[in-house]
């Protein structure tokens, strides 16, 4: 399973670790992902999504029904 938020599309980005001497070594910044079950009232079932913390805030704001409709338009399965 890839490290991508199903709602926002956040994915790992690359950057540098910086030591005290400012030496640079490559690293990855990973999104804050969680598998979370959401209750969908219209379908009377739980839906499990892999979402970031920002994705959970989007679901709180828009509602799970709207977010799932957007996923269907993009062609993603949930």
From Swiss-Prot:
Belongs to the bacterial ribosomal protein bL28 family. Gene3D superfamilies: Ribosomal protein L28/L24. The keyword Ribonucleoprotein applies. PANTHER family: 39S RIBOSOMAL PROTEIN L28, MITOCHONDRIAL, LARGE RIBOSOMAL SUBUNIT PROTEIN BL28M. InterPro entries: Ribosomal_bL28, Ribosomal_bL28/bL31-like_sf, Ribosomal_bL28_bact-type, Ribosomal_bL28_sf. One of its GO terms (biological process) is translation. GO terms for cellular component: cytosolic large ribosomal subunit. The keyword Ribosomal protein applies. Keywords: Ribonucleoprotein, Ribosomal protein. NCBIfam families: L28. GO terms for molecular function: structural constituent of ribosome. The lineage of its organism: Bacteria, Pseudomonadati, Pseudomonadota, Gammaproteobacteria, Enterobacterales. It holds the Pfam family Ribosomal_L28. Residues 1-21 are annotated as: Disordered. This is Large ribosomal subunit protein bL28.
